[in-house]
Amino acid sequence: MAKQNKGRKFFAASATAALVASAIVPVASAAQLNDFNKISGYAKEAVQSLVDAGVIQGDANGNFNPLKTISRAEAATIFTNALELEAEGDVNFKDVKADAWYYDAIAATVENGIFEGVSATEFAPNKQLTRSEAAKILVDAFELEGEGDLSEFADASTVKPWAKSYLEIAVANGVIKGSEANGKTNLNPNAPITRQDFAVVFSRTIENVDATPKVDKIEVVDAKTLNVTLSDGTKETVTLEKALEPNKETEVTFKIKDVEYKAKVTYVVTTATAVKSVSATNLKEVVVEFDGTVDKETAEDAANYALKSGKTIKSVSLAADNKTATVTLTDKLNNNKADAISISNVKAGDKEINVKNVEFTAVDNKIPEVTEVKSLGTKAVKVTLSEPVENLSSTNFTLDGKAYFGNVVMGAGNKTVILTPYSSSALSVGDHKLTVSGAKDFAGFVSLNSTHEFKVVEDKEAPTVTEATATLETVTLTFSEDIDMDTVKASNVYWKSGDSKKEASEFERIADNKYKFVFKGSEKTLPTGKVDVYVEDIKDYSDNKIAKDTKVTVTPEIDQTRPEVRKVTALDEKTIKVTFSKTVDGESAIKTGNYTVKDKDDKVVSVDKVTVDSKDSKSVIIDLYSKVSVGENTITIKNVKDATKLNNTMLDYTGKFTRSDKEGPDYEHVINADAKAKKVVLKFDKKMDAASLADYSNYLVKINDTLQTLSEDVATLSVSNDATVVTITFAETIKGDDVVFASGKAISGSGKVNVNELQVMGVKDTSGNVHKKFNGSENKITLSSTSTPLKLAKIDKDYDAKYTAELVDRKTVKVKFSTVINSAAANAFTSESHKIDSIQVNGTSTVTVKFKDEINTNASDLDLKVNLSKLVDIAGNESTNNTPIAIKAGINLLDSVAPVVVGEPVVDKETITFTFSENLTSVSIGEVLSTDFTVTRVSDNKDLAIKDYSVAIANNNQVVITLSDNREVATAYKVTAKNAKLITDDNGDKKNAIADFTKTTATKVEASGTLSLDAAKTNLNNEITKAKDAKATGTEGTAATNQIVGSKDALQVAIDVAELVKNDTAATLQQLTDAKTDLTAAITAYNAAKVEDISSLLVAPDLVLGTTDNGTITGFVAGTGETLKVTSDSAANVEVTDPTGLAVTAKAKGEANILVQVLKGDKVIKTGTVKVTVSE
């Protein structure tokens, strides 16, 4: 077989991997070496390591034969074993038979280029290997390099030429070191190499070429993290792909610097790292198993657990192994239904267990059983059951074959029951039998009859305290035996401040022998450090009283845990209950400003008041001014503190809560169709139960003044519009008489029958709520021959009733009607200003009008009219009113569209100006206004601080951003508005904040300080000239468009200040720049200080009064801080009732012009007139 060299770097890597693996996970020796003591001392370690690694084995007799020479076949076998080589092909040496023991080893080493034949046809497997030949195969196989000096060896001259370079390299690498004889060091290059010497040089070679350090130590940090230390001192943190199972030896594979290692590690867990499992085998308990031990106090704190279903947690107990917590509920779980539990703040060593929504399914399929009956002395017996049961009574028990008579007290968690017989001799010392029957668990399963023997032993030992823990607000005591709960009082436990007793305020039974005592109020909370707690007058069930002056010393743990929101519940439409994880501080908990409630439309529902629940100090009750939505609502809570001494403050919380539908439906519209149609259409404000709407027994009708149940021969019922509408269509005749809608009885023999009243009874919505009018007189609908007219209706409950339409986007207007619209003609809506794209009728009382082009954001350019006669309502009514009704901005159109930026920003020196689509206003000024924007300097991509720019509204519809940052170079700026709140449109009742935008200036703003002093003075002087011109051209007065009186004086003050700076020879560049900025702002303010003409704001035509009438001028509303001044130019005809109001009184026929002025302080800022005509 020809020599094949597959690349010798493989060998070094293989050797490293093989021997490193053997160092970590040693294998058993293949054979016991009986002659190990015959191995020379220098070779024992090398031989032992190769034997341990399974590389070298003893012979059939268990001997290594260390001094025997090694053959080429044996050397090939060592290579193959050490490097775990395998041959892919065959060898064709005539002296290597396929059945020879060395065939595979020779095939593998030849194929991998370690050995070659002595000729093309022979390998010479039994030929002894010389020391020179050993050097050659080791140097070639592992690509050793180096230059050694052989002159130090006495027999260097005997080295054959072909072997010289190999031996030099072997010596340089410390593989071959020579041997001492007669004071000389010899190589013995041509001597056969012994088995022990080959083991030594092979091991030396492996150690030499093994540049990869070995694993020295592995520390398991957690389930997925190892800290690995290598033999060269390298330390690496390794993250495993798969988490280790606690307390189980696991083989892991990992890489460090591209070298793969294997090791066996054990993740030893004593304290918990996670929740291992959650289960519920009954409906009152949830069992949480941790993967290690947890802190008893935090694990037994019910506040640290919450169920997704909202079920209330009563208590938590931790098993003796400190790994299993049993959560007992006040409510019961739903059998065979999934739920989830969240756990927080449970301590485990230096960590905390915090998990969200670990799912489990409650499965209770077993009957309850009695697990123990135990005597509590001669006066009581305790029964323990396998699971919580419903309250038991004396009928569930038989004592010694007789009916039981006595007290029955359920223990903590309803898993135990204490029986105290009335007869003092019933539990005499000795053996007794108790039969228990009919114990029902919370899934409804009932226990079988079972009889239990127990022994009564007289109890004369008083209870003692075996364990006591404390926080600054609580003391938890565990007693040596079950305590008679009738003897436990809050005042039994106290601590002393001097001679003053600080008694507990309340207590909670955690277990039959464990109670928590709560100390409320700053005057009762325990001090820090060690404190003595006294326990008095507590008894066991044998009337043994705890020793007088019993005291325990506790060191209260300071509670630094923040309160958390555990549950939010809508108690009704205007009341919310919030439950926290711990008792809350009353002062912070009742502040209404700490709570923000929003309905499903994201509108704020104002909070009226907040009180701490009198029954639960962990809960607050929130009363609202108005209703929350049926379905999902949002609540945000902040700044609430707990009642601990530290007053820990909660983190801000925002969450959803659901209000179930408990409100009865109401009529949205009642339509009485004309006499010909004989229809009544009822439109409800929510989806109804269709079956109840179609049930004739839910309606009464008065026919000829006689009330009777509606029937099919009187009318038909038709349910439509997704069960929100029912149409009652009356028959044309009843028993041959024509049906008419009229009051009273029809004249006998007239051939008519009067139908005059309909009563709607028990119709229900889909949640089963009966409609609101069911129990009152309002369920009566009077029927008449007059049909209900179609009208426009209020579009939004939160705004004035005048608004009957809404601009919802720049191509859409919605119009609200008094009833459901069935159809609209193509010309029902017309517009001369914008082309209508479509009219959408969707089976509701709202019609949507779509336009082809965009409307101004304030709808100032919209001219829309609706013709009611072109619409047909759900009752089939067609209006007779064919006069188109105008829908106009500021009149009856509600603007819900945000102002938008028009065009690109304009840069002028240090200002950036944005023009908007309509006039703007704001609720703030200056630095606060800047929070509506993010300004980014493009040159270094830095967001400016608020102090580095200011924002102002200019020329009514512009926003000017003035920069004051330090710009090292000329740069563009990117301005972003997102969720702005402070700058809104100035159009109508609804204030729409400016729309989101991001704009980058095309022009760069010059670098700071690039302006010269002379240029700055010139700029300031130009601005002063501009200010003087503005002042000179303006006219102060009270007429519309006049400058507001006093505005010139204000501008002059700003001019004077600017001139002082300009004339100051020591003025700095910054002072000149600031003065110019201030004067620019003053000019802007002056230009805006004009008396506004408010005549256009009239919403009604000029008043017309009779000579005896009083009237009110509409359309004028004074804003905050504004007053009205109203005068008449003809008081003889019309007198102003109150000069600060809008009421007028007619005096005589004629006309009067009423001047209405709006004052801010004593300055007129708005003015308008209205003509009032007095007729006869």
From Swiss-Prot:
PROSITE patterns tied to this protein: SLH
Pfam families associated with the record: SLH
Cleaved signal peptide residues: 1-30
InterPro entries: Cell_Envelope_Struct_Comp (IPR051465), Cu-Rt/internalin_Ig-like (IPR014755), SLH_dom (IPR001119)
GO CC, alphabetical: extracellular region; S-layer
Keyword entries, A-Z: Cell wall, Repeat, S-layer, Secreted, Signal
Gene3D superfamilies: 2.60.40.1220, AF1782-like
Major place of residence: secreted
Domain annotation SLH: ranges: 31-88, 89-152, 153-216
Highest taxon listed in the record's lineage: Bacteria
Subcellular location field: Secreted, Cell wall, S-layer
Reported function: The S-layer is a paracrystalline mono-layered assembly of proteins which coat the surface of bacteria.
Record-linked PANTHER family: OUTER MEMBRANE PROTEIN ALPHA-RELATED
Protein name: Surface-layer 125 kDa protein
